[in-house]
Amino acid sequence: MSAPTMRSTSILTEHLGYPPISLVDDIINAVNEIMYKCTAAMEKYLLSKSKIGEEDYGEEIKSGVAKLESLLENSVDKNFDKLELYVLRNVLRIPEEYLDANVFRLENQKDLVIVDENELKKSEEKLREKVNDVELAFKKNEMLLKRVTKVKRLLFTIRGFKQKLNELLKCKDDVQLQKILESLKPIDDTMTLLTDSLRKLYVDSESTSSTEEVEALLQRLKTNGKQNNKDFRTRYIDIRTNNVLRKLGLLGDKEDEKQSAKPDARTQAGDIVSIDIEEPQLDLLDDVL
């Protein structure tokens, strides 16, 4: 019969738990061990009878036993090599037709379930859905942590405002603070009035001094070549600015006189060209209201 293939050897190794060749090696080692015990016993017996008359033949006995041991080893190796070939080719071998038919089921394959492609795809889809759910949970957790941080900051701000408000409400012994508190009552109406006034100022500023209107005016002045009109535009913007500052109480009498003075025409023309008016942010008032 032919020599065992790699498929046959691998299946037998997995089934037995050790390579098939190790079984033959164990047999040869056991025979060699018995042979060594025999030669050792023979040498011991001959050495006990080594003296014949006055002559001692101990060295000759040791040399002869060693040669006998070598001959026995060669004989064992030669004959058990034949045994090894026979066992591997005829005993520890699985025929190819059985390997091709897949008739073997090992111990670890008894509960093995063969899954078809449809079930495999369903399992992959379920696994993918679980992974997406886990990722979504991580994202929600991250968003919640950010919101918790914002809420903690807001809570800290509210506590500080509450502390300041309590200090303001407890100012019964301070006459000056009592007068200020009385002048602000009712506080809700005062805050509403301030926000309405600020909104009106923003709307007026956008309708009269927006960036688009100023740029359109400068373009018209450059096209027509009427540089004198720049003085009127500058004075107009100064008057509107002074009115706004005066309503807010931020402009004194001396500052009013300085702002109403006529500047040099060249300075006015240079300033108008470099005017950079920012757009009013009306959404800031929405947060206040």
UniProtKB/Swiss-Prot annotation:
Q: Could you give one GO CC term from the UniProt record?
A: MIS12/MIND type complex
Q: Does the keyword Glycosyltransferase apply?
A: no
InterPro entries assigned to the protein according to its UniProt record, in alphabetical order: Centromere_Mis12
Q: Which domain of life is it from?
A: Eukaryota
The main location class comes to nucleus
Q: Where is the signal peptide?
A: none
Q: Where does this protein have coiled-coil stretches?
A: 105-147
Phosphoprotein listed as a keyword: no
Please state where this protein is localized.
Chromosome, Centromere, Kinetochore; Cytoplasm, Cytoskeleton, Spindle pole
Q: Which UniProt keywords apply?
A: Cell cycle, Cell division, Centromere, Chromosome, Coiled coil, Cytoplasm, Cytoskeleton, Kinetochore, Mitosis
Q: Per the UniProt entry, what are the Gene Ontology biological process annotations, in alphabetical order?
A: attachment of spindle microtubules to kinetochore; cell division; chromosome segregation; kinetochore assembly; mitotic sister chromatid segregation; protein localization to kinetochore
Q: Any further remarks?
A: Present with 2610 molecules/cell in log phase SD medium.
Described by its record, this protein's role is as follows: Acts as an essential component of the kinetochore MIND complex, which is required for the spindle checkpoint and kinetochore integrity. MIND plays a role in establishing a bipolar spindle-kinetochore interaction by joining kinetochore subunits contacting DNA to those contacting microtubules.
Q: How does it assemble?
A: Component of the MIND kinetochore complex, which is composed of at least MTW1, NNF1, NSL1 and DSN1.
Which family is this protein grouped under? Belongs to the mis12 family.
**What is this protein's name?**
Kinetochore-associated protein MTW1
